Amino acid sequence: APEKPEGEAPDGQGAPDGAGQTEEITLDDIKEGDVVAITLDDDGNAATITVQSMDMGGGQGGPGGQASGVDSYDTVNEYSSDETVSDTSLESTGTDENAALISNGAEVTFSNDAISRTSSDSQGGDNSSFYGVGAAVLATDGTAYVKDSTVTTDSKGGAGLFAYGDGTVYVADTDITTQQDTSGGIHAAGGGKLYAWDLNVETNGESSAAIRSDRGGGTMVVDGGTYTSNGVGSPAVYCTADIAVNNAELTANGSEAVCIEGLNSLRLYNSNLTGNMSDDDQNDTTWTVILYQSMSGDSEVGNSTFQMDGGTITSKNGGLFYTTNTECTIALKDVDITYNDDSEFFLQCTGNNNQRGWGQSGANGSDCNFTADSQDMKGNVIWDSISDLDFYMINGSTLEGAFVNDESNAGNGGDGYCNVVIDKDSTWTVTGDSTITSLSNAGTITDADGKTVSIVGTDGTTYVEGDSDYTITVGSYQDSADTSASTTVDDWSNYEVERPESL
């Protein structure tokens, strides 16, 4: 379902359109592929079983892109053969209809057009999120080229530009504004492809990321432009696809900056990223970037990837990186980070007790490979025993913080670990007592006063005798660093797409 780790968007995390829609079912009604959340009592028995993803009339399909789709689309203008549409206005005012639909393999160029979509009766919801129902411009089988145009929507489910299935959208030098819920700026789902250059995108509703993807994923490449989301539960980028962004301004004024779910990837290059998520009692914490698995069925379970090379991150509330109930790879290289005064962590890699059911409590940690390359960092790294964290510092990276083992969301615990590897050019400035499973240090470890920090084994062995007030407790220690399993940030050239001559 739409991007709502904060849980305030109207569709509900992983719920069908109209989150209040419920019905009593039996075990016979649950089929393979349905997603269920099970709440256990103190004895480990199932207390409640809630089906989070099955067809109950709201357009909800199976997990991982196996949804049934829609039979047909209502549209004002359908283009099934090659055409150029220029210097004109395309308007849609009907319920859940498109202003322009590209089908039958057509190639359609929109040049200097004003495209609008306004409806007070549209429903939005999953059919809009997954299939593009109600989007201003939708390509399902064919290619849309959009340039020097304006796209505005004021209806639920009113995405600006949507690529679905065999549809591809190329867009440049265009302004996109959406007003209502479930209305992303540019959107790909079901394997669609969308390529954008120098756009100005603003969204104002809930579940309305400026750069948005959903069930079935796809490919999105963004080069230049400004992307702003203002609604709650509306990150600048909601990622259930493979997305690469270069030289862009990405701002979420009412949400986390980035949400990545499941087997998907986001790579940012020389971009400026800002998040401002509000605190919410449903959540265990507050974050700026989240990598997780919601169990809604909207993304295939697997390794989430976040890479950022250059640019800036500004966190206006909460901690920085939060990962839970997933596997993930995070790599930062030379990113300038601005922290808020109340930041609780730099990285939290733990299980969760989130009220929306992100995995089974006590068994929903994160397996995270984190690499800092030429990267300055501040804040604590929080981990627990149901998570696996490999934390690499290479090429002159610095960390001012502590490694904190926090079992609050680990249930009965597990055999997870936190392994820290520091190369010869990197420095850890310790700000509090720390607990690490394995420490491999070829670099420098001191406190803020330059004092040596004691490193003591859990068996009582003193590896380093220090004069600092702080102690690092380790399961094992070595004064060398093998960084071969660290992550190398990919080059933008691997994802850059040549701008078509028609744009």
Language-model segments: which ranges?
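Disordered, low-complexity segments in secreted/periplasmic proteins that are enriched in proline
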Residues: A1-D34, D42, T48-D71, M295-G297, ...
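Surface-exposed edge beta-strands and adjoining flexible/disordered loops or tails in beta-rich
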Residues: T50-D55, G165-V171
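N-terminal segments that cap or nucleate solenoid repeat domains
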Residues: G64-S122, Y470-I472, D479, T487-L503
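Beta-strand-rich solenoid/repeat architectures in extracellular/passenger domains
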Residues: G65-S68, S81-D96, S111-G132, G142-G157, ...
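Glycine-rich beta-solenoid repeat tracts in large extracellular/virion proteins
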Residues: D71-E78, N98-N104, Q123, V133-T140, ...
